[in-house]
């Protein structure tokens, strides 16, 4: 069973030109460190990064996602694709749930457009077989809601602040 969610936002970046915002996004480490806690982002080889989130509570679980993702700039948009995500804190259920995310940040005149497609997949031989589907769907939807809320908050604060700071240093 799979639960999906898409979420997008437009972020106003006053007085920023399209070439300036392209310059900001052209080196993926810049916006990623603005979006995520820069002390928890580790650059790996080939445009890949490792990130360990801070723990958060969902129902009776203290969850801490750890993600390996790839990020690249193609001249038009920054693409972020999760390659592997481990959700620590699920105990025996850990290997029964798979989280996937693909996100894009596209620059326009005076704004950044951010979009993410998220999914949680429950193993049909594990959690999908043990728990009622309505419960799995509600729990999955709640979890994805927490993730999108957190992503939007990071975009509205960290990404905008990072872009404005970079633009001030690189007019």
Positions of PLM-derived features:
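Solvent-exposed residues in well-ordered beta-strands and their adjoining turns
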Residues: 10-14, 54-56, 72-74, 106-108, ...
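Low-complexity, acidic/polar, glycine-enriched regions of mature
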Residues: 11, 24, 79-86, 91-93, ...
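Amphipathic hydrophobic-ligand
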Residues: 1-4, 60-67, 91-101
């Amino acid at each position: 069973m799979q639960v999906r969610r898409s979420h997008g936002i437009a972020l106003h970046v006053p007085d920023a030109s399209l070439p300036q915002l392209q310059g900001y996004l052209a080196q993926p480490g810049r916006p990623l460190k603005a979006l995520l806690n820069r002390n928890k982002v580790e650059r790996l080889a080939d445009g890949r990064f490792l990130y360990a989130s801070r723990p958060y509570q969902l129902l009776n679980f203290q969850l801490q996602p750890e993600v390996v993702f790839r990020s690249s700039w193609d001249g038009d948009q920054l693409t972020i694709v999760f390659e592997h995500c481990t959700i620590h804190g699920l105990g025996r259920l850990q290997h029964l749930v798979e989280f996937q995310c693909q996100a894009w940040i596209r620059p326009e005149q005076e704004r950044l457009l951010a979009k993410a497609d998220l999914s949680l997949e429950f193993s049909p031989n594990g959690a999908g077989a043990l728990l009622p589907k309505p419960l799995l769907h509600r729990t999955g939807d709640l979890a994805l809601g927490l993730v999108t809320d957190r992503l939007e908050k990071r975009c509205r604060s960290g990404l905008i602040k990072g872009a404005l700071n970079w633009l001030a240093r690189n007019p």
